[in-house]
From Swiss-Prot:
Gene Ontology CC: one annotated term: plasma membrane-derived thylakoid membrane
Residue intervals passing through the bilayer: 14-34, 42-62, 79-99, 108-128, 132-152, 167-187, 206-226, 240-260, 276-296, 302-322, 330-350, 374-394, 409-429, 462-482
Protein name (database record): NAD(P)H-quinone oxidoreductase subunit 2
Cellular compartments annotated: Cellular thylakoid membrane
Length: 506
C-alpha cells in the first residue's frame, strides 16, 4: 500500500517530454563519440526525433494534465505545457538554423546539440518546478549549459569574453536566489512554493520583503529586464548567433514561466508589492531597451536591446494579473518565438555569406537577395507591432488587457516605445531597399550569387520559411493562438484560485 501511494505521488508521466529530451542528449553524445562524420549525419536526426516526440507528448498531455508530480515538486499543468511547448519548438527552430553555422565554424556538431538539448531540458523543467530545490536545479541546468554555449567558439576571443561575463553575472544571480530561498525556508519550514505562500501570509516582515526582492532579481536576470540587463548586449554580440537566437526565446520563456508561478503562489499575498516592482521593471525595460537600440551599429546588439524592450511588453500582461493579461503574455511569447527566430535566421544567412554583422553592410541587400530582405523586413515589422503581422495582434491583446486593468501608465509607455522601435526597425528595412545600385554597401556588391531552390531545402531555409509564414499570417493565426493561450490559463488550477480571489477583492 505505501508503495502504491508513493507511485501515485510520483506521477512520473508528467516528465515524459523531458525524458525524450534526455534520451536525445544521450544519443547525440554517443554519435559524437563515433566521430565527426557520423555525428554530422545522425545528430540532427536524433534531435528532430527527440524534440518531435517531446512536442507530441506535450500535445497528448494537454487534455490530461498532471497537476502534481514527484511529491509536489513538479506540475505539468496546462500553463507549464504551453511554456514547455514554446521552448521545445524554439529549440527545434534554433537547431535548424544552427547546423550550417556550426559546420562552418569547425565546431563538433554532436557536442553542440547535446549542450543545446541540456539547456532545453533545464528550461522545460523550470516551467513546471514548484519547489525551491527543483527550481534551483532546473535554473542551474539551463544556466550552465547557456554559459557553455556562449563560449562555444573557443578560437574567438569575443565568445570567450561573452561566456565569462555571462558566468560571472549568472553566478551572482544564482547566489541571490539561494539567499532569498534561505529566507523563505526559514520563515515557512518548507521548500514547496504553495506551502511557503500559505505560511508567510500572516508573517509580513522585512525579511519576507527582502526575499521577494531577491527572487525578483533572479527573475529579472533571466528575462533580461532593466536594470539586470547589462550582460545581454555583450553576450549577444560575442556569442555564436544561433546560440543568441535560442537564448533570446528559450531562456526568456523559462524565466517568465518561473515568474508567473512563484509570484502567483509564493508571493500571492504580496500582490501590490511585486506588481509595483514589476511595473518599474517593465517601464525601464521598454524605455531603455528601445531608446538605446536606436544608436546600435551591430545587428545582434540591436536585437539584444530589442529583446530587453520586448520583455517589458510581456510584463504588461503579468502585471495586469487578469486571465486576459496572462493569456496575452503567453500569446506574445509564442509570437515572439517566430518573429525573433525569423529575424535571426536572416541575420545568420547574411553573416554566413558575408561574415559581417554591421547594419550598414545590409545597404542594398534587396538587389542581391530579395528573400532575406523580405523575410527580415516582415519579422522586424512584426517585432515593431505593425499590422497585419502576428506581433501587432500580440501587442494589441497585451495593451487591451493592461488598459482594462487600469494599467494606464504601462500601456502609454508601451505605445510610445513601440513607435520608437518601429523607427529603428524601419531604418534597417530602408537601408536594405535603397533605390540606386551605387548606394549598396561594398559587402553587398561582392555578395555571392544565390539560387533558391524549393526542392531539397536545407534546414536553415526551412526554419526561415516557417517563421516568415507564421509571422505574416498573423491575422489568421492570432485568434486560435489566443484561444489556446486562454485555455492554458483558464485550465490551470493555481491560476484560477488566484484569479478568483482577485475578482472577489475587486
Amino acid at each position: 500500500m505505501p508503495n502504491e501511494i508513493f507511485t501515485i505521488n510520483l506521477n512520473a508521466q508528467a516528465i515524459i517530454p523531458e525524458a525524450f529530451i534526455l534520451l536525445g542528449i544521450v544519443g547525440t553524445l554517443l554519435v559524437d563519440l563515433a566521430g565527426e562524420k557520423t555525428a554530422s549525419r545522425w545528430a540532427p536526426v536524433i534531435c528532430y526525433i527527440s524534440l518531435g516526440s517531446s512536442l507530441i507528448s506535450l500535445a497528448l498531455q494537454w487534455s490530461n494534465p498532471v497537476n502534481s508530480a514527484f511529491l509536489g515538486s513538479f506540475n505539468s499543468d496546462n500553463l507549464a505545457i504551453a511554456f514547455r511547448s514554446i521552448i521545445a519548438l524554439s529549440t527545434l527552430i534554433s537547431l535548424l538554423i544552427s547546423w550550417r553555422y556550426t559546420e562552418q565554424s569547425g565546431s563538433p556538431i554532436g557536442e553542440f546539440a547535446a549542450i543545446v538539448l541540456s539547456a532545453t531540458l533545464g528550461a522545460m523543467l523550470l516551467c513546471g518546478s514548484t519547489d525551491l530545490v527543483s527550481v534551483f536545479i532546473s535554473l542551474e541546468t539551463l544556466s550552465v549549459a547557456s554559459y557553455c554555449l556562449s563560449g562555444y567558439l573557443k578560437r574567438d576571443p569575443r565568445s570567450s569574453e561573452a561566456a565569462l561575463k555571462y558566468l560571472l553575472v549568472g553566478s551572482a544571480a544564482a547566489a541571490v536566489y539561494l539567499y532569498g530561498s534561505s529566507f523563505l525556508y526559514g520563515l515557512s519550514g518548507s521548500t514547496n512554493l504553495s506551502t511557503i505562500g500559505v505560511e508567510i501570509i500572516n508573517k509580513p516582515s522585512f525579511i519576507t520583503s527582502l526575499s521577494l526582492v531577491f527572487v525578483l532579481s533572479t527573475v529579472a536576470f533571466k528575462i533580461a529586464a532593466v536594470p539586470f540587463h547589462q550582460w545581454t548586449p555583450d553576450v549577444y554580440e560575442g556569442s555564436p548567433t544561433p546560440v543568441v537566437a535560442f537564448l533570446s526565446v528559450g531562456s526568456k520563456t523559462a524565466g517568465f514561466a518561473f515568474a508567473i508561478r512563484i509570484l502567483s503562489t509564493t508571493f500571492s499575498s504580496f500582490d501590490e508589492q511585486w506588481k509595483l516592482l514589476f511595473t518599474i521593471l517593465a517601464i525601464l525595460s521598454m524605455a531603455l531597451g528601445n531608446i538605446v537600440a536606436l544608436a546600435q551599429t551591430s545587428m545582434k546588439r540591436m536585437l539584444a536591446y530589442s529583446s530587453i524592450g520586448q520583455a517589458g511588453f510581456v510584463m504588461i500582461g503579468i502585471v495586469s494579473g487578469t486571465q486576459d493579461g496572462l493569456s496575452s503574455a503567453v500569446l506574445y511569447l509564442a509570437a515572439y518565438l517566430f518573429m525573433n527566430l525569423g529575424a535571426f535566421s536572416c541575420v545568420i544567412l547574411f553573416s554566413l555569406r558575408t561574415g559581417s554583422d554591421r547594419i550598414t553592410d545590409y545597404s542594398g541587400l534587396y538587389q542581391k537577395d530579395p528573400l532575406i530582405t523580405l523575410g527580415l523586413s516582415l519579422c522586424l515589422l512584426s517585432l515593431g507591432g505593425l499590422p497585419p503581422m502576428l506581433g501587432f495582434f500580440g501587442k494589441i491583446y497585451l495593451f487591451f488587457a493592461g488598459w482594462a486593468n487600469h494599467q494606464y501608465l504601462l500601456v502609454v509607455v508601451g505605445l510610445i516605445t513601440s513607435v520608437i522601435s518601429i523607427y529603428y526597425y524601419i531604418s534597417v528595412i530602408k537601408m536594405m531597399v535603397v533605390k540606386e545600385p551605387q548606394e549598396a554597401s561594398e559587402i553587398v556588391k561582392s555578395y555571392p550569387e544565390i539560387n533558391w531552390n524549393i526542392i531539397g531545402l536545407p534546414p536553415l531555409r526551412i526554419a526561415l520559411y516557417t517563421c516568415i509564414a507564421v509571422t505574416a499570417l498573423g491575422g489568421i493565426l492570432s485568434n486560435p493562438l489566443f484561444k489556446l493561450a486562454n485555455s492554458a490559463v483558464s485550465e490551470t488550477p493555481f491560476l484560477q484560485n488566484i484569479l478568483a480571489i482577485t475578482n472577489n477583492v475587486l
